[in-house]
Amino acid sequence: MTSKEKIPTFNTEEDVESYISFNAQAKIYDDFAIDLQAVESYIQEHVKPKTKVFHSTKERLDFLIKNDYYDEKIINMYSFEQFEEITHKAYSYRFRYANFMGAFKFYNAYALKTFDGKYYLENYEDRVVMNVLMLANGNFNKALKLLKQIILNRFQPATPTFLNAGRKKRGEFVSCYLLRIEDNMESIGRAITTTLQLSKRDGGVALLLSNLREAGAPIKKIENQSSGIIPIMKLLEDSFSYSNQLGQRQGAGAVYLHCHHPDVMQFLDTKRENADEKIRIKSLSLGLVIPDITFQLAKNNEMMALFSPYDIYQEYGKALSDISVTEMYYELLENQRIKKTFISARKFFQTIAELHFESGYPYILFDDTVNRRNAHKNRIVMSNLCSEIVQPSLPSEFYSDLTFKKVGSDISCNLGSLNIARAMESGSELAELIQLAIESLDLVSRISSLETAPSIKKGNSENHALGLGAMNLHGFLATNAIYYDSKEAVDFTNIFFYTVAYHAFSASNKLALELGKFKDFENTKFADGSYFDKYTKVASDFWTCKTEKVQALFDKYQVKIPTQENWKQLVASIQKDGLANSHLMAIAPTGSISYLSSCTPSLQPVVSPVEVRKEGKLGRIYVPAYKLDNDNYQYFKDGAYELGFEPIINIVAAAQQHVDQAISLTLFMTDKATTRDLNKAYIYAFKKGCSSIYYVRVRQDVLKDSEDHTIKIKDCEVCSI
């Protein structure tokens, strides 16, 4: 939402009563169809009276262009007759909101409003039209094809794109960024400046702290001079607080630290409930990078060494983040020129668990897991605010005036999600759906304005990395009589993402013919084909359905599962013509767009069949699960807290085999769980090959039918897309 827009307010309590009453009855009486009455009441009582009326498409379009609501450049890529036809086609699909929350979310957060906030200027169809006009880039026939995919909820662009497409006064189409900080004042200063600029533009920024020298390290060879990373964290937190989008919301930021950094325990202590105000970090999110060796040390009940990043750089000429601590651990341990301190590995993991119960932080990135899966020559050193983006980066170098001596390569996230249920229902059109989705995300990467962050601009222009994700897994499973914690659920997840990966790589391969290969393609495991060995050098029936029920589903929806021969042909084409994009898939939490699409979030199970949300002045909103009715209720009945961590990790691990980046994995624990239970969850996720752990949510025991109480964590509005 742009800084000039305000959310419309309700004039009277009567405005609220009827549709809120209908919505509440969906929970009270277990009559989920009543929620559709809430939708109708909301549209009639709230939306229509506050929607500006136009007598023709031309009158509306002229008004929106003349008054700087719509970007004339987007409109002018098409004739008026084409615009009118696309708009007419959009309304011909007769889109209807599946629940009250979907309608409320659209008009509250996405619909274009007059600058004074009094009137709506768009319905859902109009917002979709502006997206397809931009994403089709002047191609009328493509716009019609893409219109079908979006308005049928098969593909949903991420919030920054869906919200801002076609607007004259807008934010960026991409709102998630990753920045390295190196161990010098110029890099620190430039990072803070860039953070302010990106946050000013509604961006969420993750920053790497692993390479900063520890507290007590030398400065200009004088010992015990460095203050360590905590003061930098304070500066960053203040920067995000200051850059608060004109008071609309505080900037979103995260910092990642390698767990073998000497300041790691102080880093974690900043999130303690009883932390001293001098070190306490309230709003900045924390993430840890944990290599395999740390788990091995904990398993053996050994002490873990923390290595001076300053000494590592002096000795090896490499930053801490750019070496494999697992591979070099014992060499570093024996090197007398590397200062080291020791802590108990098990105590370290216990501290993480304690903090997860207190705050939900830190995020965890499994260092060696993501780098083993990495197809590129440079190391992955961090993730983003939702722990689904894992891409290599390169450091920048600066002059003393903070101008660039050498522009490195940093990261931005271009995201969008498939609705799994609707994608399966697309049947034989699945390949076209994924082709259009990849092309749309690719276009966003090519039109995004990133001048304020030259290293991010360079990384984006060289790589055009994408993050095609997915949502509504639980919704699809439940409506097809499959329990979330069943072998059929894992089987379906495996084969679905196997199929999506094939079509995503195929789409990028076709784009490469038109747009060229991404930079350094020749130096990747894609170019030599080894990345695809998991598909081409296994038994021909390895990637096939293992349960009759799942095979029957693919047959029912007429979704063709790629064969090994299909993969071999695709790999040959990739080796010949390349890929347009360095990365293709990443599964974000999909908070906002799941509500907008009235479906279940990401790959997670629902929290309960009817979720309770608090939405400002409206109070509680009851959100029935996807197509919830009395027939499928039993498949939604056990929510995330009842299921426990194992089924969720099993699902994520099945998908992760085919996702070249990461998957936002949230763990749900009851208040009966112990730190030992959480440690078991970390180990299980690590052993199953998950790339990361996002939040840990802990539910407190409450009275039946009262609101679900969890540790209140500020969801990332940027990355939950």
Swiss-Prot record:
Residues engaged in binding substrate: T159, S175, C176, G204, N384, L385, C386, S387, E388, P589, T590, G591, S592, I593
Keyword Thylakoid: no
GO terms for MF: ATP binding; ribonucleoside-diphosphate reductase activity, thioredoxin disulfide as acceptor
Site (Interacts with thioredoxin/glutaredoxin): C716, C719
PROSITE patterns: RIBORED_LARGE
Gene3D superfamilies per UniProt: 1.10.1650.20, 3.20.70.20
GO cellular component, one term: ribonucleoside-diphosphate reductase complex
Activity control summary: Under complex allosteric control mediated by deoxynucleoside triphosphates and ATP binding. The type of nucleotide bound at the specificity site determines substrate preference. It seems probable that ATP makes the enzyme reduce CDP and UDP, dGTP favors ADP reduction and dTTP favors GDP reduction.
Intrachain disulfide bonds: C176-C413
Chain positions of site Important for electron transfer: Y694, Y695
Entry keyword annotation includes Endoplasmic reticulum: no
Function, as annotated: Provides the precursors necessary for DNA synthesis. Catalyzes the biosynthesis of deoxyribonucleotides from the corresponding ribonucleotides.
Quaternary structure annotation from Swiss-Prot or TrEMBL: Tetramer of two alpha and two beta subunits.
Membership in a protein family: Belongs to the ribonucleoside diphosphate reductase large chain family.
Protein name: Ribonucleoside-diphosphate reductase subunit alpha
